[in-house]
Amino acid sequence: MAKSKGISVNYLRNKEQLNDEIDYKEFKYKKYFELVCKLIPDVKNETLIVKAINEELTNKEGIVYVFVINGKIFKVGESINSIKDRVQSYNCGKLEYRLKGTCSTTNFYVLQSLLAIGEEVEVYGYFPELPEYTLFGEKYKSSKSASKVAENLIIKDFIEEYNKKPIGCTQQ
């Protein structure tokens, strides 16, 4: 693992590292997911470009998502925000920021891995029903708990079925 100033700069370097990952076609939850957008790696600008397949869903909040590269599951994640906003966060995973320690390890790992692999990423999304909360006499809908619970259930089942997490799921 490469290090600079004691900060990890480890990430996937090529698409062959995905060979042992699980095929999306085997993903037992896939019937609940639909293609939302594609991510196009832009190595020159060290960024991911969001190419909406479904504009409404690309901007919809409260998503559980699966990143698929050449049919292989790279990552399962969730966001209380839209996938468009989540990708903007991943785009903060620049090497310069990592060396300064100013970006998260997850954002760095995902962005740099996807840039190094250099393949289009299919993003499939599932949108759990938003739970309704009453706080201080007002009603609110929030995706935070429903999508986080859904992500955790999927990861737990994934580990039970395949004895590992998707390669891009680096958090404990």
PLM region spans:
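Boundary/linker segments flanking structured domains
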Residues: 1-62, 68-74, 79-172
